[in-house]
Amino acid sequence: MWKSKRNVQITYTLLPPSSQTIPAEQTDRLDDVVSYQSLDSAKVSTVHGVDKIAGSHDAWDWRGRGWLVIAGSHWEVLGWGEEEGGNAWCVTYFAKTLFTPAGIDFYSRGRQGLRPETVEAIKEGLAGIEDVKDLAGSVFEIKVDDGN
């Protein structure tokens, strides 16, 4: 889905828990907004959804909002860390949906993305995990420019 996109940004915001028995600081729900541009357009598009914990705190189920309410997906945090200099990163696995194949995403808090050596180290680590090693080889970089 992202190969034809650029300037992808994902913003997660805590939502009130689904139950009053869950402390607010341990909420089981996130507001999830993705903005992006196509490679050849200045228009910014958005996808809005809600993530809800799916079992463990590392697994989430996403449900679209608006016309995407029919869409859903499952994703899991595989790892996270911080580069020298403070650029935080996270790696997620997402399951196949009606619209996308299964895959792996690398997230970077910094707009500049991850250093090549960080990307290679993460890929090496993923190559040792049987369930995701094939997907690790298909990771690609998303274009970032001054458009968004």
Residue positions per predicted region:
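A beta-rich soluble binding module of mature secreted/lumenal proteins
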Residues: 1-148
